[in-house]
Amino acid sequence: MKKIEVDLVRTKVYNLLKEMILNHELKLGEKLNVRELSEKLGISFTPVRDALLQLATEGLVKVVPRVGFFVTDVDEKFIRETIETRIMMEVFCLENYFDKIAGSEELLEIKGEIDDVEKSAKREIFDDSDERLHKLFIRASGNELIISLYEKIWDRIDLVRHLNERYVVSNREHKELIERIISGDKEGAIEKLKEHLKNVEAETIKNLYTYERS
């Protein structure tokens, strides 16, 4: 097989496995049998192993020597550290680049998506607006290092946020947050962002104890 074809297969397998982890088709803490996954995906052993090794570097898979691969498990510490890091980064960016965020056309586009979620209650629309809003704060900094660091932890954020079932409530909090930004209420927006993220933390931890593991 040519190198370009090998790379395409590896990328496809990586994306498939990543999606299976994030939507919890592969359960938190589940042991991953490479040969079974190879058969399920109809692909050879090597691309699956390579994809799992890549996912391990991103924190979605854990490698235990002489034992095998496991989906990263999530506990209270994992959730608290993830949210704490988000608060540090997102609040800093909202506070220091408030005017740039408030004047962004994308903010109005996101507000439109939030209105759509209110009408349809569709999780997929919420997930898109959620990612766009929080990444908007980070990108507004224009700081390539901050943006890069946030992207590196996004898979961890994604794993946590898919445990949160309160998306209709989160959507309302997003709407209130955007309204405060648009109105120029900087301090109110900062407090709302902190409150929102702490609410996500509390609800995710609560859901953790009802999550059905493998």
Task: Identify the role of each PLM range.
Residues 3, 190-214:
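C-terminal effector-binding regulatory domain of bacterial HTH transcription factors
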Residues 102-166, 172-179, 188-199:
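Conserved amphipathic alpha-helical segments that form helical-bundle/coiled-coil interaction surfaces
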